[in-house]
A protein has these predicted regions:
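Arg/Gly-rich low-complexity intrinsically disordered repeat tracts
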Residues: 4-25, 32-37, 245
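Conserved nucleotide-sugar phosphate-binding/catalytic loop shared by glycosyltransferases and other
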Residues: 71-116, 126
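Active-site and donor-binding regions of nucleotide-sugar-utilizing enzymes
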Residues: 44-49, 55-66, 106-219
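Nucleotide-sugar donor-binding patch of glycosyltransferase catalytic domains
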Residues: 373-420
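C-terminal amphipathic helix plus adjacent low-complexity
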Residues: 414-455
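A donor-sugar binding/catalytic signature common to diverse glycosyltransferases
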Residues: 141-142, 149-152, 164-165, 190, ...
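A nucleotide-sugar donor-handling region in carbohydrate enzymes
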Residues: 48, 81-84, 187-294, 450
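Donor nucleotide-activated moiety binding/catalytic core segment of transferases
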Residues: 123, 326-361
C-alpha cells in the first residue's frame, strides 16, 4: 500500500531525535546492521506504546517484526512513558535498543477525568500526523487503555490497517471493557489471547477470518525466564532468596530483597527469621482519589498484619491514582525499610524475575490473572478490576476490598502451591511470532479495510 525502499536510521538521526548524544547499545547496533541487509521495505508497521506494562507485552512482537524480511518497524511512544511522575519509562524503550520514531504527549499527569479526555484528543492528532508523514501501513495497538484507543482512532481515520492484540477480554475495571470493545470495532485484524475471547469478538460482528487466537504475549518472555530458573541460569532480582512456601519457610534463609526503581540496587533487607515475599500492584478503578486511597490503606494494613516483606509498585495513571500514591508514600515514611520498598516502575524483565521469586502477588493487576500462574506465584486479586477475566490456574484468591478480607485472602494464598511453567488457557509463550507472521503475510488491500457486520 505505502511501502517503499528506505534507509535504516543512522545513529546521528537517533541522537537528534532524542536530543542527546549517547553511544548506541550493542543491541541497537545489531538492529541497524540488520536493517541494512533487509532489502526493500514492503510494509511499515507502527507500534503504539503508552505504558511500561503494555510495552513489555508488545516487545516480543516488535522483535519478530524487526527480524521479518521486508518489514520496517516504527515505534510511537506516548502516554505515561513521557511522564517523570510515572518513571519516564521511555528510557526503558530506548535502553532496549529501539529508536523511537515519534513521541506524542497525551496526559499531563493530573488526576482529572478531563486530563484523560484532552489527552485522548492530543494523542489522536499527534499519532495521525506521524502515520501520514511516515507512510505507515499497519498500526498495532494492545489492550484497553486510552493510548491504544488513540492509536486505533488515528489509524482507522487515516485509512491504515489497525491490528488489535488482547481484544475480546472481559474485565470490570473503570472503562476497560468500553475502550477495549470500541477498539475492536475500529480494528481490521484481531489477536485475542484465548479461544473464548476470540469467540466474543466474532459475536460482536467481526468476521471470523480476521480473528487469530495467539495466546497472551505476556507469557512470551516469561516462558524463557522460567526455563532459565529451571536450568539454574536465572539472574536473581530478589537476591539470595530461595522461594519459600509455608512448609519450608522456617528453614529458608532469605537475606535480601534488592529491588530499586532508581537502579542503585539499594537492598531491602529481610530478617533471618524468613518472611514470605510479596509484590503489590494496585491500580485505580476510576473512583475518587479518596476512595482509592482508602482501598490502598486496607491493602497495606493487611500486608503489615500478615508480616510480609513487600515490594510496592506505583499504579497506572487512571483516574484516582493520586490517592493510591498518597497511601503508598505515607506508608513508606512509617514502614520498616527492611520490609517495605517502593518503586515507580520496573523494566519488564526485572518485574518478571521478581514475580518468579515472589511468594505472592497482591493487588488488581492483570499479570495476577495471566502471568502469575506460569511464574509459580500465588495471587490475591482484590476488588472488581479483573472480574470477568479467565483464570489461569487455581492459585488465585479473589477478595473484597476490606482489610479483613484481604488479610484472610493473603493467608489462604500462602497455603497454595502453584506449579511454575504449568499450562494455562493463555497459551504457550509464542504469541509475538504468531502476530508477526500474520502481519507480514496478510494482503493489504481494500477488502481488508472495508468492514461489514458479519451476522
Amino acid at each position: 500500500m505505502r511501502g517503499r525502499a528506505t534507509k535504516p536510521r543512522s545513529h546521528e538521526a537517533t541522537k537528534e531525535r532524542h536530543g542527546k548524544a549517547t553511544k548506541p547499545s550493542r543491541l541497537h547496533r545489531d538492529r541497524l546492521r540488520h536493517e541494512a541487509t533487509k532489502g526493500t521495505v514492503t510494509r511499515k508497521i507502527a507500534f503504539i506504546t503508552g505504558t511500561r506494562a503494555e510495552y513489555g507485552l508488545l516487545r516480543s512482537t516488535m522483535e519478530a517484526i524487526h527480524k521479518g524480511k521486508g518489514l520496517q518497524l516504527q515505534v510511537v511512544a506516548t502516554g505515561t512513558h513521557l511522564l517523570k511522575k510515572f518513571g519516564h519509562t521511555i528510557d526503558d524503550v530506548v535502553a532496549d535498543g529501539w529508536p523511537v520514531d515519534a513521541r506524542v504527549p497525551m496526559q499531563r499527569g493530573d488526576d482529572r477525568a478531563l486530563d484523560q479526555a484532552e489527552g485522548l484528543a492530543r494523542g489522536v492528532a499527534g499519532i495521525a500526523r506521524f502515520l501520514e508523514q511516515a507512510q505507515t501501513d499497519i498500526v498495532v495497538v494492545l489492550g484497553d487503555r486510552i493510548e491504544a484507543m488513540a492509536g486505533a482512532l488515528a489509524g482507522a481515520t487515516t485509512g491504515r490497517v489497525v491490528a488489535h492484540i488482547h481484544g475480546g477480554d472481559v474485565a470490570a475495571g473503570d472503562w476497560d471493557d468500553t475502550l477495549r470493545h470500541s477498539i475492536t470495532k475500529l480494528s481490521h485484524l484481531h489477536f485475542p489471547a484465548t479461544e473464548s475471547a476470540g469467540r466474543r469478538i466474532v459475536r460482536m460482528g467481526e468476521s471470523a477470518d480476521r480473528v487469530h487466537v495467539i495466546g497472551a504475549p505476556g507469557l512470551d518472555r516469561l516462558a524463557e525466564l522460567v526455563r532459565h530458573q529451571r536450568d539454574g541460569r536465572h539472574t536473581p532480582t530478589i537476591t539470595g532468596m530461595t522461594r519459600g512456601r509455608p512448609a519450608d519457610r522456617a528453614a529458608a534463609h532469605r537475606p535480601s530483597l534488592a529491588l530499586d526503581a532508581s537502579r542503585k540496587g539499594e537492598p531491602l533487607r529481610v530478617r533471618k527469621e524468613s518472611r514470605s515475599r510479596a509484590i503489590i500492584v494496585q491500580h485505580p478503578c476510576g473512583r475518587s482519589a479518596a476512595h482509592e486511597k482508602k482501598v490502598m490503606n486496607a491493602v497495606l494494613r493487611a500486608v503489615d498484619e500478615t508480616g510480609l516483606a513487600a515490594l510496592c509498585i506505583y499504579p497506572n495513571s487512571d483516574r484516582g491514582h493520586s490517592g493510591i500514591v498518597e497511601a503508598i508514600e505515607a506508608h513508606r515514611r512509617r514502614a520498616d525499610p527492611e520490609r517495605f520498598r517502593v518503586v515507580r516502575s520496573m523494566a519488564r524483565d526485572d518485574y518478571l524475575r521478581a514475580l518468579i521469586e515472589a511468594d505472592l502477588l497482591i493487588g488488581n493487576s492483570s499479570s495476577g490473572i495471566i502471568e502469575a500462574a506460569s511464574a509459580g506465584t500465588a495471587v490475591v486479586d482484590i476488588g472488581p478490576r479483573q472480574r470477568g477475566r479467565e483464570p489461569s490456574g487455581s492459585s488465585i484468591v479473589h477478595c473484597d476490598e476490606t482489610h479483613e478480607a484481604i488479610r484472610g485472602a493473603i493467608r489462604s494464598a500462602l497455603r497454595k502451591r502453584p506449579i511454575m511453567g504449568g499450562r494455562t488457557v493463555y497459551g504457550d509463550g509464542n504469541a509475538g511470532p504468531r502476530v508477526a507472521a500474520v502481519l507480514a503475510s496478510v494482503p493489504l488491500d481494500e477488502t481488508l479495510l472495508r468492514k461489514t457486520i458479519a451476522y
